[in-house]
Amino acid sequence: MTQLKQARKGIVTPEMEAVAKTEGLQPEFILKGIADGNIVIPANKLRKNLKLCGIGKGLSTKVNANIGTSTDFGSVASEVEKLKMAEMVGADTIMDLSTGPKINTIRKAILENTCLPLGTVPVYQAAVEAKDHYGAMVKMTADDLFGAIESQAKEGVDFVTVHCGVTRQVIDTFKGQGRLTDIVSRGGTFTAGWMVFHGAENPLYEHFDRLLDICREYDVTLSLGDGLRPGCIADATDRAQVAELLVLGELVKRAREAEVQVMVEGPGHVPLNQIEANVRLQKSICEDAPFYVLGPLVTDIAPGYDHITGAIGGAIAAAAGADFLCYVTPAEHLSLPDVTDVRNGVIASRIAAHAADIVKGVNGAAERDHQMAIARKKLDWETQLKLSLDPEHARVTRDRFKTRGKACSMCGDFCAMELAEKHLGVSVSRC
């Protein structure tokens, strides 16, 4: 029985209780959110010792870290190292986006080495295996694709990105639209390429009930991918993107009717003035399904710093109602990320998530900032470090220059906090 089915029966599951405890909320709040479809708990029923994570309305904004090999680079050891770094700096979930050799071995190693919910894009496995077996990705069969989905579900994968909304009608809209960057989603490109080669409908859309059967059996959460997400700000919120979103809205309804948990993925590259509108549009069309956004990146001209462009967009999107941020690393658009990129990407997205949670009124978010302000007024460095999102980095930075007094090396004897207390009588007790 899925979490959604149990919620509709009024059954508070151990998973709901665990999420409620983490969020500082009542279990009944989580139950209602799942029953209504605006909260999901990605938790394959076969996973053991899972660190449960609730995603959706009224909960803290969550952060996902993508890892995985490419055709030319990556190994089990390197991906496990990235995984451990992502865990250490506070990622809530992991996605394995491997497309390199030993794709199944990599995924199994990640599952064995993490307690975080794991997501995948099963079409990657199907495409890699089709290239190996048939000589071309487009020669995979629908059975190959569904076989990959089911095998990953049996392994314990908790959520799957599936590009069900890339339909023949949506592709026609895309062709008529005209874009600068065409299709930038790998899964979207694989799917569209297969459809053109075979002259057939997207099997994930045509046989959506088959997909639902697999997800219901293992309680795998569907993450409806945005195969036509904009790849530059000039393409943002165009007809092709919206056409796909309309299809996803229909599929959200069908998933809920089948008692399968579902969330929806979103853009992409979006200028600042369109982000809130994108969130509102998704929430309306998809009936408040949890919204999982990549960034969004607010400018195209910052390669090497896209963890910053993504964090800017992510903060605005989450404050407007997005629930789940997929991190962006400094390596975005340039290379496969290394372990340092993973660290920087997670931290940047966690900053964005926390900033948004203050706006949302998430339990405890603003209080943490209040406690930080008190610690700063007291020049209580240990408490400041403890409260920081990245204590290790903060400590290293603090210790670079030793000072004689309590003030930092920026101000020294001219510390504004110390001078205010000394000459104006403004003590910490007023905080």
Curated annotation (Swiss-Prot):
Cofactor(s) needed by this chain: [4Fe-4S] cluster
Binding locations of substrate: 66, 95, 124, 163, 185-187, 226-229, 265, 292
Co-factor remark: Binds 1 [4Fe-4S] cluster per subunit. The cluster is coordinated with 3 cysteines and an exchangeable S-adenosyl-L-methionine.
GO molecular function, one term: carbon-carbon lyase activity
Pathway(s) served: Cofactor biosynthesis; thiamine diphosphate biosynthesis
Catalytic activity reported: 5-amino-1-(5-phospho-beta-D-ribosyl)imidazole + S-adenosyl-L-methionine = 4-amino-2-methyl-5-(phosphooxymethyl)pyrimidine + CO + 5'-deoxyadenosine + formate + L-methionine + 3 H(+)
Disulfide bond annotation, renumbered to this chain: none
Transmembrane segments: none
Record-listed E.C. numbers: 4.1.99.17
Pfam families: ThiC_Rad_SAM
Biological process, per Gene Ontology: thiamine biosynthetic process; thiamine diphosphate biosynthetic process
Ligand binding (Zn(2+)): 269, 333
Functional summary from the UniProt entry: Catalyzes the synthesis of the hydroxymethylpyrimidine phosphate (HMP-P) moiety of thiamine from aminoimidazole ribotide (AIR) in a radical S-adenosyl-L-methionine (SAM)-dependent reaction.
Name of this protein: Phosphomethylpyrimidine synthase
Species of provenance: Dehalococcoides mccartyi (strain CBDB1)
